Every structure is written in structure tokens, then in C-alpha cells.
Design a protein with these regions (language model features):
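A short, acidic/glycine-rich surface segment
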Residues: 38-39, 58-63, 96
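Hydrophobic side chains in well-ordered alpha-helices
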Residues: 16-19, 83-87
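Exposed loop/turn and edge beta-strand positions of beta-sandwich/beta-sheet ligand-binding modules
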Residues: 37, 69, 104
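Core segments of cupin and vicinal oxygen chelate
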Residues: 8-50
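Vicinal oxygen chelate
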Residues: 31, 42, 84-125
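N-terminal beta-strand motif that seeds the catalytic metal site of vicinal oxygen chelate
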Residues: 1-17, 70-73, 124
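Mid-chain, well-packed structural core segment of small domains
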Residues: 72-84
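Acetyl-CoA-dependent GNAT
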Residues: 55-59, 122-125
Length: 125
């Protein structure tokens, strides 16, 4: 069994697409408008799964994803310090890290435009 995709409800689809493409390097593979007021984009990582971003005009007016969501997304990186430098060069705020955890793995955290926590993990191998 493999994870096919992760769905995230977003406030602004275009802003979210740009973040996931420009900051995280995901590829925009498909967009659909299945019904009035709903827009969906699928983005993928070349090595793993797909992220589905959904903007719904009615939900966006009342739903505060940053307060109600328990979603976080983790990406494995080869070098946490290089990733932190890359993010800082793109003017992205590092909210925590680098943190070394028992076992030697290193972590750093940012947030996407919707308040979703993004974790970068350098595994100790």
C-alpha cells in the first residue's frame, strides 16, 4: 500500500500553489474545477506522493485552517543546514530548528501560507 495523496484545504489556491512550487520544489501536475466555487490543484514530488490543494469560496470565508487543522507535512532532506539557508534566501521564516533529536536526526520547521506546518528532516543514517 502507498499513500496516493494528501489533501489540504487552502484559503488562496494560487498563493498556495506558488509556495509549494517555488519554496518546496513541487511540480504542478493538474488543475480541475469540479463544481462552482471549488478549485483543485495537484502537485507532486518527484520521489514520493501528491499534495491536493482545494480552495472552496464558501469554506474559505469561515474556515481558519491555521486554527483548526492538525495537518503537517514532512520532507526528508540530505542536509538540514543547506535547506535552512535555501529557505532563508527565499525569505521564509524558520519557526523552529535546526533541532537535533535523540538518535541524531535533525529537524527544522516552517509554515505555508495557510498555517500548515512543514517539517524538514535530515535522518541520521
Amino acid at each position: 500500500m502507498n499513500i496516493k495523496f494528501i489533501t489540504i484545504k487552502v484559503k488562496n489556491l494560487e498563493e498556495s500553489i506558488n509556495f509549494y512550487k517555488e519554496i518546496l520544489g513541487l511540480k504542478d501536475i493538474r488543475r480541475i474545477n469540479p463544481m462552482g466555487g471549488t478549485k483543485i490543484a495537484f502537485l507532486e514530488d518527484k520521489n514520493s506522493g501528491t499534495i491536493e490543494l482545494i480552495e472552496n469560496e464558501e469554506i474559505s470565508k469561515t474556515y481558519d485552517v491555521s486554527k483548526e487543522s492538525m495537518v503537517s507535512i514532512g520532507f526528508e532532506v540530505k542536509n538540514i543546514n543547506e535547506k535552512i539557508d535555501e529557505l532563508k534566501n527565499k525569505k521564509i521564516n524558520i519557526i523552529r530548528g535546526p533541532i537535533e533529536v535523540p538518535g541524531g536526526s535533525k529537524l527544522a520547521f516552517i509554515k505555508d501560507p495557510n498555517g500548515i506546518e512543514i517539517e524538514f528532516i535530515e535522518e541520521n543514517r
